């Protein structure tokens, strides 16, 4: 008669030479294996070593007002006023909620709040063309609030079991951005770009991954709605013998972004062409972009996002395509404007860099023509400046002027040796 092998009551593994199983000593039919015993011991050690003061510090995130948050966005993001207002309110409410939920009953400033009401979080969906400022807004406020941020592309994510990146790896990136501090990561921001590319109706289909995109959406739903997730601290695929870190996603702010090409058609069909200014017009890209401000959750479901995911993205706002005038401002006005960055680089080597107005406008026109938005400005600048940058160490004491011809026709810029200002002695 074969002896029945014992199984671990926690992981259901059979007893083996390298994984012995012991009885609990209390209940006859309850067993625990060596692996689960080690994991349990590590978890208990973590709880015993917790420093309550550190936990409180992790929760104590500064919460500037929505006006202060928008003012910070105004320093780096040109235009998009409505989107910046909505985003600022959403971020303010999110971190105010975390602070309120962490207060004890005695710490509540108002007796009305002492009623066991727990505030739920509102994640954000930003709809707008490539290079319109979606990622920059999230990065700017994360830096301002001194919280970690992880940025992922939804097109690289796959359902468990397919070739590609596990959805949980987003949280691994966030943990790494928090320098391994779990508590800090649990109050961070996750930005998922190109969320529209994993719609159930996506044309980008492949036999090597979930063809509908719904599996990836379901996997995202689990972490977005708030749950405790086991992640490998160094990323990669999960396997039974590796160590995991537990992250609670309940207080992580998820921001999703996408261009949603074709969404305007869905909105127009729903409205029946009864929107002022669109009835009887010839369809164009500008018309579709203008229609996006009328977007409703049902339109996004028709586009191919699952209702459960839309139900977790409570704050929806749209960003407009960037005009030529706005593109020129992006190049020159923000604190970290590209023109200012290049001028700083030249200053370090003792040279002075000037851009003629026509040159800046030409850069903006090229970015619009390439349909890359503000994101494409740097590559245009790099292409136009590469030869000059190569010679830069020998240009100390020169004034260099970039003209329209330098940008459009690759002509060499004007280089003039600066005159030394020698004062005569009296």
UniProtKB/Swiss-Prot annotation:
GO cellular component: HslUV protease complex
Keyword S-adenosyl-L-methionine included in the entry's annotation: no
Positions that bind ATP: 129-136
Domain ClpX-type ZB per the UniProt entry, residue ranges: 1-52
InterPro entries: AAA+_ATPase, ATP-dep_Clp_protease_ClpX, ATPase_AAA_core, Clp_ATPase_C, Clp_protease_ATP-bd_su_ClpX, ClpX_bact, P-loop_NTPase, Sigma_54_int_dom_ATP-bd_2
Transmembrane regions listed in the UniProt entry: none
MF GO annotations: ATP binding; ATP hydrolysis activity; ATP-dependent protein folding chaperone; protein dimerization activity; unfolded protein binding; zinc ion binding
GO biological process: cell division; proteolysis involved in protein catabolic process
UniProt xrefs under SUPFAM superfamilies: P-loop containing nucleoside triphosphate hydrolases (SSF52540)
Annotated binding of Zn(2+), by residue: 8, 11, 33, 36
Keyword set, alphabetical order: ATP-binding, Chaperone, Metal-binding, Nucleotide-binding, Zinc
Family, as annotated: Belongs to the ClpX chaperone family.
Subunit structure: Component of the ClpX-ClpP complex. Forms a hexameric ring that, in the presence of ATP, binds to fourteen ClpP subunits assembled into a disk-like structure with a central cavity, resembling the structure of eukaryotic proteasomes.
Function in brief: ATP-dependent specificity component of the Clp protease. It directs the protease to specific substrates. Can perform chaperone functions in the absence of ClpP.
Protein name in the entry: ATP-dependent Clp protease ATP-binding subunit ClpX
Organism per entry: Helicobacter hepaticus (strain ATCC 51449 / 3B1)
Gene: clpX
């Amino acid at each position: 008669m074969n002896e029945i092998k014992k199984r671990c009551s926690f992981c259901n593994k059979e007893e083996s030479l390298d994984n012995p199983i012991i009885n609990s000593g209390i209940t006859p039919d309850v067993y625990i294996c060596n692996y689960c015993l080690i994991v349990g011991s590590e978890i208990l050690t973590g709880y015993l070593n917790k420093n309550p003061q550190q936990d409180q510090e992790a929760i104590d995130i500064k919460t500037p007002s929505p006006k202060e948050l928008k003012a910070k966005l105004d320093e780096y993001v040109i235009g998009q006023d409505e989107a910046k207002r909505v985003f600022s309110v959403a971020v303010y409410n999110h971190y105010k909620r975390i602070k309120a939920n962490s207060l004890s009953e005695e710490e509540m400033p108002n007796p009305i709040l002492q009623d066991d009401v727990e505030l739920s979080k509102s994640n954000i969906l930003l709809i707008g063309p490539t290079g319109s400022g979606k990622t920059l807004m999230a990065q700017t406020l994360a830096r301002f609030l001194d919280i970690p941020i992880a940025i992922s592309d939804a097109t690289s994510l796959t359902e468990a079991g397919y070739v590609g990146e596990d959805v949980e790896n987003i949280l691994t990136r966030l943990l790494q951005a928090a320098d391994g501090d779990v508590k800090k990561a649990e109050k961070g921001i996750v930005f998922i770009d190109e969320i529209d590319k994993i719609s159930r109706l996506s044309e980008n289909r492949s036999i090597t991954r979930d063809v509908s995109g719904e599996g990836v959406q379901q996997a995202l739903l689990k972490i977005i709605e708030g749950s405790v997730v086991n992640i490998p601290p160094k990323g990669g695929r999960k396997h039974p013998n590796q160590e995991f870190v537990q992250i609670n996603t309940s207080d992580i702010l998820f921001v999703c972004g996408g261009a949603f090409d074709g969404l305007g058609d869905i909105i127009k069909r729903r409205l029946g062409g009864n929107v002022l200014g669109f009835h009887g017009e010839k369809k164009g890209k500008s018309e579709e972009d203008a229609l996006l401000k009328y977007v409703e959750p049902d339109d996004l479901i028709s586009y191919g996002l699952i209702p459960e995911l839309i139900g977790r993205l409570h704050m929806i706002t749209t960003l407009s395509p960037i005009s030529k005038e706005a593109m020129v401002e992006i190049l020159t006005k923000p604190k970290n404007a590209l023109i200012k960055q290049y001028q700083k680089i030249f200053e370090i080597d003792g040279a002075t860099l000037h851009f003629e107005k026509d040159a800046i406008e030409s850069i903006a026109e090229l970015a619009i023509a390439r349909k890359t938005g503000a994101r494409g400005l740097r590559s245009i600048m790099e292409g136009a400046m590469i030869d000059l940058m190569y010679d830069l160490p020998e240009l100390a004491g020169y004034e260099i002027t970039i003209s329209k011809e330098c940008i459009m026709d690759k002509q060499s810029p004007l280089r003039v040796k600066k005159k030394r200002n020698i004062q005569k002695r009296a």
